[in-house]
């Protein structure tokens, strides 16, 4: 947001210099990102003075040049060669002396005046045309001044050229109230008043507003009060299109707006003055003399000011005549209804549009205008009538118009102040410093915050509705601190905090640990969109369609919901690569998943229905180990992925023997299991079902793991590295074949083994699984290998046999297992 220092001083009476103003604005939260000195005429015409042509003779060696003597107020006339056809004795002109730098046409290209000889005659300056000075476009001849112009007067003084300072304020999205010169002046005045200065904001006087006649009545009808809570309008007739005055053009250029004509410039001027967007319609183009605020039928074509035809939706608020749409409300005008060179009668629109409606429409059409920027953040709902009066009076003054109607103001449900309580104790607690109560009251008064009641150190306050960023106690305390001054809160010399903290798992460190391990083992990280297709979730039980978080204004049907699982993103990546003959894949992805649960929603806390989880997905497909001269190719399998999962969990310090592993019945997988620790599910792993693969056109088997990374972080234990002396005594290996029911898992047997022989059992592994006709129905065979070791002595056969008998007995008692002969 560009703020002109000269323009700002129209509304606040202060002797502060531009640099001091910029410093204060930064201190109170309106960060100044740029500061630049500017001139209404580039270069300020330094070295250009008023001159009087004393003599004008023909050049001895040219039929179109003149040799002149010019009085520039120094007492010694200058000889200057001039080729202008209107050069003559007695003329008052603007003369550029030697050394002057001009910027012809107001551009960036310099032109320096030098002592020179023109066809043998010395010339000590230049008599200037308008375009050479950068103050106009005419080059028909030298610029003629009135006869009363005094020779020697600097062009800067004669033309009243002023220096200005451009202050570029980086507005945060919540401070739309400061998106105008009045808004910035209001903040500056609050700062000065809180420090005892008698300063107030001088609002432009609109008391002279009164209709000159009632010849141009326009009826206004609002059909959608939700989208347009307030709509005001007034007409001005018999306007004359002309350039706006120099002072207004200078203001607009400082704000970054190119002047166009007086009517358009007035609406832009009021926008940057008051922060209220206006729209001026050519009243002659309003059919039926009626303005209707409504939506149009889906697909209605509409041509905007840029000449582009756009298809409207039923959710786009439009400003219409009795017959057709004329303007996209709060966003962009129409090509056939705006101000043109033939306009004489004007309808001025001044409205408050619902920010949500404007934001959705602006995003839908990809339009970002000065008006939509303000409307979608929330303009002052009490400024509309004032702004309409201001614009109408300016059109009367600068375009010779006649105010031809009363102001029509449709405002059925006035927007009230934001009301809440704030306590002095809470102010001190949040700021970290005691601020005297009188200082707080002074700041609140300076911010135009009304104190409705005070009791037991608690203030009941009313905040003006133009401060859309201050709607609760914490917001107001931030505003108090902003005006009080961040730099006035001292940094304490001592930190009141314990120096010992309970160690907490670092999610980022664990992410890096997982990523390093997976990447080192041939996996490739992918990154996919959090938005996905709603069709993926239709008919699923694992992730129901009604639990999707839906986007209100999706970019396309393919990106209409937030993902509940990373599975579909992973399958899209597999399908994309497989179609390009890259079917051997090992992939992983970190990402958030999003959920909606209507049962958790309440009027007091509607956001409780929404939740998200951070997850890690891993997938393998195709060949896991490629062939080489000494290795046969190995296809990816469920066990390939399970091995990766267990190694990853070990790296996180999780005892995999403490995991509870259960079979998972899911419509996502043809076979799967879950791993949980202390009742908290950590991951699901399985073979993706054919039905799911068919949805995405994936033909090959995909083995997939999805880990709840947040649960994993909470389950992680810090590694304690303990050095142990290597055992001097040998290990003993024993194998055992067990006949068990099909539902018995190796994990269950392993848990029983370690619970039975904690002292001697070093490890247990599964090296064979057999199911076939030679076994009873419902049975399978596990071949287990046990490593036994005693750190204090060499195991004898008696101790080994006793340990194996204990294991066999517990397997039979707890798992129904029998030793195979």
Residues covered by each model-derived region:
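Extended, well-folded interaction surfaces typified by the phenylalanyl-tRNA synthetase beta subunit core
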Residues: 420-585, 734, 787-791, 799-821
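A carboxyl-terminal module marker
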Residues: 2, 442-452, 469, 473, ...
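Phosphate-backbone binding interfaces of nucleic-acid-interacting proteins
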Residues: 1-212, 347, 366, 370, ...
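Glycine/proline-enriched, intrinsically flexible loops and inter-domain linkers
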Residues: 5, 23, 27-28, 40, ...
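Class II aminoacyl-tRNA synthetase-like tRNA-binding/catalytic domains
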Residues: 116, 292-332, 336-339, 495-612, ...
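Conserved mixed alpha/beta core segments that line enzyme active sites in large multi-domain catalysts
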Residues: 49-80, 152, 249-250, 267-336
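Terminal amphipathic helices with adjacent charged low-complexity linkers/tails
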Residues: 188, 192-222, 399-427, 433-434, ...
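Mobile "lid/hinge" segments at catalytic clefts and subdomain interfaces of large enzymes
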Residues: 119-134, 138-144, 155-165, 169, ...
